[in-house]
UniProtKB/Swiss-Prot annotation:
One of its GO terms (molecular function) is glycine dehydrogenase (decarboxylating) activity. InterPro entries: GcvPA, GDC-P_N, GDC_P, PyrdxlP-dep_Trfase, PyrdxlP-dep_Trfase_major, PyrdxlP-dep_Trfase_small. This is Probable glycine dehydrogenase (decarboxylating) subunit 1. The glycine cleavage system catalyzes the degradation of glycine. The P protein binds the alpha-amino group of glycine through its pyridoxal phosphate cofactor; CO(2) is released and the remaining methylamine moiety is then transferred to the lipoamide cofactor of the H protein. The keyword Ribonucleoprotein does not apply. The keyword Disulfide bond does not apply. One of its GO terms (biological process) is glycine decarboxylation via glycine cleavage system.
Length: 435
C-alpha cells in the first residue's frame, strides 16, 4: 500500500483537538538530547545475501549457549532441549502464536492443547489446567486474582523469597485493583513462617519452591497455616523439581503455577517462554485463560473444543475471569512435546541436577565460596564472595557465566543437566584463581 502522509491541514486539526501547538509537544516527555534533529541517513536497500551477511556478522559477536558455559540462574536456565521439540513445533500446522478464532477447525492444535493440560495435571497432581499463560510471573498474578474471586478477600500474603520480578509483576497487576499486598520476611534464606500471625481477611499465600535463592521451603507447614485461616495456597514451582520433590497436590496447594521455560524451551535471551497454571476442579469456573476440552460430535466421534470460555472476548467484560488472549501457546506446545519424550525420566533428571549442584556447591565452599545460608536446595544456590560483580565479570571474560548478583557479596550459581564435571571443575579452578 502506498504511503500517504497527513496533510498540513489534517495535522493542524489533530493538534487543535488535543490542545497542542505543534508536533514537537507530542514528544515533550522525551529528553531533548535523545531526539534526532536531522533526517535519517539510511543507505539504499540490501538484497537477501547482503542482509544475511550483515546479521551473520552481528551474531558472531554474541555468545550463545553452545559457545559459552552457563551457570546462570534466577529464572532462565540452560537445559537440554531434544531436537524433536524444535522440529515438531516448527510444523506449519502448529507454527503460529494464535489458536484460530474458529478453533474447532484446528483439531490437531486443540488436541495438542488438551494433551498439554493433561501432562501439567499429571506433573503437579492437580485436577485441571489451562492452556498456558504468558510466563510464570503473570501466572502467579492471575492465581492471586482468581483466589480473590473465589473467596472475596482482598489481602494477599507474598513471601520475600519469591522471585523479585514476580513480586514486581504482581504489584503491576495491583494498579487499578482493590487489594493489599503484604510480604512475609525471609530468615536464613527461607520464608519466616513464624510471622504468620494476623491472617484475618487474607485471600491467599504465595510461596515459591524452590525459592528465588534455590532453597527448599516448608510447603507443608505453609499450607496448613493458610488453610486454618481460611485462605488459599498458591504454589509457584520449578516443574523439573517435581521429579524428586513432593507434588503440590500432596502438600495441599490450591493453585499451582510456574515458569515453563525449563520444559523444552531455549533460553532465547529471556523469552518468549510460558506460564503453566493448574488448580482444583472446584475452581474451574474461576480459572483464567483458555482451556481445551474433549467431547463427541453429532456422529459420536471424539473431538476437541475451547470450553468454558470466560475470557473478555467471549463474554461481558465485567464477568470475565481474565483478558488473557494471545498466550504463548507455541512454547507450551514445546513443553508438551518435551514431557512426552522425557516425562518418564524426570526423576532421573531431577536426581542428576541435584547431585551435580550439590557437588559444585561443596567444591566451591572448599575454595572459599561458601553457601550464603546452609539450606537444602535444588538446581541453584547462592554463594558468598568478596566482590560478587567482579567475580561475575572475570568469569564472563573466560566464557563462564554465573549469576545473577543478589547483592555486593552474594551471587547465584545454577547447575543443569548440561553441566558436566569438566565444566564444574573448570569453574572451580577459575574461581579459586580469583581469591
Amino acid at each position: 500500500m502506498r504511503y500517504v502522509p497527513h496533510t498540513k491541514e489534517e495535522i493542524k486539526a489533530m493538534l487543535e483537538a488535543v490542545g497542542l501547538r505543534n508536533v514537537d509537544e507530542l514528544f515533550s516527555d522525551i529528553p531533548t538530547e535523545a531526539l534526532l534533529k536531522r533526517h535519517l541517513q539510511v543507505e539504499g536497500g540490501w538484497d537477501e545475501e547482503q542482509l544475511r551477511a550483515y546479521f551473520r556478522k552481528a551474531a558472531s559477536s554474541i555468545p550463545d549457549a553452545n559457545s559459552a558455559v552457563y551457570f546462570l540462574g534466577g529464572g532462565v536456565y540452560d537445559h537440554y532441549v531434544p531436537s524433536a521439540v524444535d522440529k515438531i513445533i516448527a510444523l506449519p500446522e502448529f507454527y503460529t502464536a494464535y489458536t484460530p478464532y474458529q478453533a474447532e477447525i484446528s483439531q490437531g492444535t486443540l488436541q495438542a492443547m488438551f494433551e498439554y493440560q493433561s501432562l501439567i495435571c499429571e506433573l503437579t497432581g492437580m485436577e485441571v489446567a489451562n492452556g498456558s499463560l504468558y510466563d510464570g510471573a503473570s501466572a502467579v498474578a492471575e492465581a492471586v486474582l482468581m483466589a480473590m474471586r473465589i473467596n472475596g478477600k482482598r489481602r494477599v500474603l507474598v513471601s520475600e523469597c519469591v522471585h523479585p520480578d514476580i513480586i514486581e509483576v504482581l504489584r503491576t497487576y495491583q494498579l487499578g485493583q482493590d487489594f493489599e499486598i503484604l510480604t512475609l520476611p525471609q530468615k536464613e534464606g527461607v520464608t519466616d513462617l513464624s510471622e504468620l500471625e494476623d491472617l484475618s481477611n487474607v485471600s491467599c499465600l504465595v510461596m515459591q519452591n524452590p525459592n528465588y535463592y534455590g532453597f527448599l521451603e516448608n510447603m507443608n507447614q505453609a499450607s496448613e497455616l493458610i488453610h486454618k485461616a481460611g485462605g488459599l495456597f498458591v504454589a509457584a514451582v520449578d516443574p523439573l523439581s517435581l521429579g524428586v520433590l513432593k507434588s503440590p497436590h500432596e502438600y495441599g496447594a490450591d493453585v499451582v503455577v510456574g515458569e515453563g521455560q525449563s520444559l523444552g524451551n531455549h533460553m532465547s535471551y529471556g523469552g518468549p517462554h510460558f506460564g503453566f497454571f493448574a488448580t482444583k476442579m472446584d475452581y474451574i469456573r474461576y480459572m483464567p485463560g483458555r482451556m481445551a476440552g474433549q467431547t463427541v460430535d453429532v456422529d459420536g466421534r471424539v473431538g476437541y473444543v475451547l470450553t468454558l470460555q470466560t475470557r473478555e472476548q467471549h463474554i461481558r467484560r465485567e464477568k470475565a475471569t481474565s483478558n488473557i488472549t494471545s498466550n504463548h501457546w507455541l512454547m507450551a506446545l514445546a513443553s508438551a512435546v518435551y514431557l512426552s519424550l522425557m516425562g518418564g525420566s524426570l526423576p532421573e533428571l531431577g536426581q542428576t541436577i541435584l547431585n551435580r549442584s550439590t557437588y559444585l556447591a561443596q567444591k566451591l565452599a572448599s575454595v572459599g565460596y561458601p553457601l550464603w545460608q546452609r539450606q537444602y536446595f535444588f538446581k541453584e544456590f547462592p554463594i558468598k564472595a568478596r566482590d560478587a560483580e567482579a567475580v561475575q565479570e572475570a568469569l564472563a571474560d573466560s566464557g563462564y557465566y554465573v549469576g545473577p548478583v543478589i547483592d555486593e557479596h552474594t551471587l547465584l550459581v545454577a547447575v543443569t543437566e548440561k553441566r558436566t564435571k569438566e565444566h564444574m571443575d573448570k569453574l572451580i579452578e577459575l574461581m579459586e584463581g580469583l581469591r
